[in-house]
Amino acid sequence: MIVSYARVVSTVSVICVALLWTVTASGQAAQAARLTPADYIEIRQLVARYAYAVDTGADNGNVYASLFAPDGAFADRMGRETKGRDALAALARRNTRGPQSAIHFIVNHVIEPTSEGAVGKEYLLQLRIGEGERPNDIFGGGHYEDVYVKTPDGWRFKRRQFIPSEGGPRPSRDAAAR
């Protein structure tokens, strides 16, 4: 059987193009799943700003809402989801009563890149500020599970879920193994 040189070159060219496309596509996916040092810092700042916003109710809840993507959502301890900035600002207003009475300590932040942005987990301890004879005390805690997206305004929460430590699910073991 005689095979023409042109047919061999054509077949090899098709195979090379297919391999090049596969390598390029997988390289782009791997590159998309990377975060820069600046990304890590910005995401940590987002979480720190969240603690201040939720504790103080800054700007009538609007600072809290601005930390979420326009279609972002927060899921509370019961799994109820509040979605969209207007609803999130209203949630922050409802949950802030008078002078600051609690402080969120958000610690042990783990951030992992994804093809869409990043995910994160961190622990929460809530300190209740004492009044009169009542001393300060830790009155709650749990952990957050976050989905972050990069927007034109910087990193924002796409979704944030609070899971209480009392009887709630534990953080997944996958995150601890990384």
Where are these regions (language model features)?
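Active-site micro-motifs of SAM-dependent methyltransferase domains
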Residues: Y52, F74, F162
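N-terminal secretory signal peptides that target proteins for export/translocation
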Residues: M1-R7
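A solvent-exposed, acidic/Ser-Thr-rich amphipathic alpha-helical stretch
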Residues: N60-L125
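Bacterial N-terminal signal peptides
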Residues: S10-T24
